[in-house]
């Protein structure tokens, strides 16, 4: 016990035990303990009475704390069950989440006064943030279809949004043409808790390096990528692309790599640790609007498209990349720079891309007002087109995907179809934003 307690804590415990035994007239036990615990004669009857009741108080206090912990654990389990039940996952609606694709919209949110440029889902709650050229951010309950609040702070159009931060302390990051990045705290009614300054031109995109991380990545038309520690507000690294405008940035799932795309028509792959470019993806004939790393769940399909005999290990986070551009095409790449497929079908600028968490589909939006779904298991064939909005579709995001749903490498990862799949724990919900000033939810 004395190895766990400090000397003063141990002394207090010994005296409390002696005082308790004295109060119940166990005099022989008191004498033995005084000798064994080496409590000197200065601890007389008057001092002993000051310690009476202390042991009982601590004992009952521990019992109350144990009961409170059990009650809180039970309450937490109940809330988690309620959350899992309320959230309209494909599983809860009897659908197959691996093959789920959006159909008609469930909600249409209309409150912005100008084009919606970006959307982002809260990782835990049914909250959705949308940013607009009207310089505001709006927070919606996408489950109930209600507007919760409007955030004002940016002086020019909001360019991008992302939720992140350490577990239990989620932060919303926003960026704008006003050259600033703002951090908003959902736990404080979305108060603007910090403003990050440093870019010399419009900030195009923000992404947290990992879902539960304090590191934020920003990309700008000043041709730089900045890495920020949101807990301090300091810029910890600047990467100079030595090129032109950067329109988009996307981190790999482990946070070790970045892909950027912009005005020079090339996508670049960067190693975060060294801040060096490791590959250039050259092939588009106009500005690149969006870029994203493929999840490991899609590796087997992309490996087949690339003509590889075996898929890369699922533990690798940066094997394949998709880019979309103003040349109306989507290109699929090996991250080392080899073009493996060009997807043609959109009739206008491609503005947003995401991979289905199940790995089978790539979903895109464009200024042709549509959402298009491409089946990677069929070589990237266009299998579905949805007329999503009445004007340009500017952005798309998938609902929260638990980190545990990203597969890990096993010895059979390239042989077993079971190990290649993602556990269907993700929510099948998509949000889009449009130049028609609306946000739509597809479930």
Swiss-Prot record:
PROSITE patterns for this protein: LISH (PS50896), WD_REPEATS_1 (PS00678), WD_REPEATS_2 (PS50082), WD_REPEATS_REGION (PS50294)
Residue ranges of every copy of the LisH domain listed in the record: 9-41
Biological process annotations from GO: cell division; establishment of mitotic spindle orientation; microtubule sliding
Gene Ontology, cellular component aspect: cytoplasm; microtubule; microtubule associated complex; spindle pole; transferase complex
Intrachain S-S bonds: none
Swiss-Prot/TrEMBL keywords: Cell cycle, Cell division, Coiled coil, Cytoplasm, Cytoskeleton, Microtubule, Mitosis, Repeat, Transport, WD repeat
WD repeat boundaries on the chain: 111-152, 154-194, 198-238, 241-280, 283-343, 345-384, 388-427, 429-443
Gene Ontology molecular function, alphabetical: dynein complex binding
Compartment(s) where it occurs, according to its Swiss-Prot or TrEMBL record: Cytoplasm, Cytoskeleton; Cytoplasm, Cytoskeleton, Spindle pole
Entry coiled-coil feature ranges: 60-87
Cell cycle listed as a keyword: yes
Transmembrane spans: none
Highest taxon above the source species: Eukaryota
Pfam families: LisH_PAC1, WD40
Subunit comment: Self-associates. Interacts with nudE and dynein.
UniProt function note: Positively regulates the activity of the minus-end directed microtubule motor protein dynein. May enhance dynein-mediated microtubule sliding by targeting dynein to the microtubule plus end. Required for nuclear migration during vegetative growth as well as development. Required for retrograde early endosome (EE) transport from the hyphal tip. Required for localization of dynein to the mitotic spindle poles. Recruits additional proteins to the dynein complex at SPBs.
Family designation: Belongs to the WD repeat LIS1/nudF family.
Domain notes: Dimerization mediated by the LisH domain may be required to activate dynein.
The protein's name: Nuclear distribution protein nudF
Originating species: Aspergillus niger (strain ATCC MYA-4892 / CBS 513.88 / FGSC A1513)
